[in-house]
């Protein structure tokens, strides 16, 4: 099943409002930053701490709605906020939960499932294994930048591996548009070679430009064309 445009639950709208506020406040802090692998948090970021206290579980899972579900987008935003806040412990726990539960234990072998929560039988796990490319791009970006800023080789390697998989599984050549990022790997080709379903909000230009800048020579042109 592909991701669909479900109605927004009030709790998810609150999460989105907090996310947009944090994005507006926090993005300048990352721009132009240079690596300081030994740096600690420079100071309190009250909005990030409020977000974490309200939505982030101790194990690194972000609660997205009243049903206790988690979306890959929420995990990707939390990774970005933790990076901007220089909050390495939270970044590590968010990544660990995301890798264990949405990537089935290995970032290098698959795209993350976009929806996780309680199943009909009462067990908790993946509810929809399709991926959401906006989350995938932000996760790859956060990992690559965390690797650069904190000098963590594993983060850089994971980010680059995920970026390669995004190109392989979530892009297509569209007539008149060229190489294009699809919203996910499954469910967005309406008619093969003729019609596709797109979502322009899934194209964060600053993240795409950064992924193009750090991509291997053989794929840099593909990223630049998105």
Please report, for each region that a protein language model flagged, where it lies by residue.
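Short N-terminal micro-motifs specific to bacterial/archaeal maturation
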Residues: 6-7, 69, 81-82, 130, ...
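Substrate-binding cleft of extracellular glycoside hydrolase catalytic domains
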Residues: 103, 108-165
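Structured catalytic/translocation cores of nucleotide/phosphate-coupled proteins
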Residues: 15, 79-82, 94-99, 105-107, ...
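Extended ligand-binding clefts on enzyme/binding-domain cores
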Residues: 37-46, 68-72, 133-134, 156-226
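Well-ordered alpha-helical scaffold segments within catalytic/enzyme domains
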Residues: 74-88, 97, 137-152, 203-218
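N-terminal secretory signal peptides
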Residues: 1-10, 14, 18-24, 28
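Low-complexity, Ser/Thr/Pro/Gly-enriched N-terminal "stalk/linker" regions
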Residues: 21-26, 32-73, 83-129, 176-180, ...
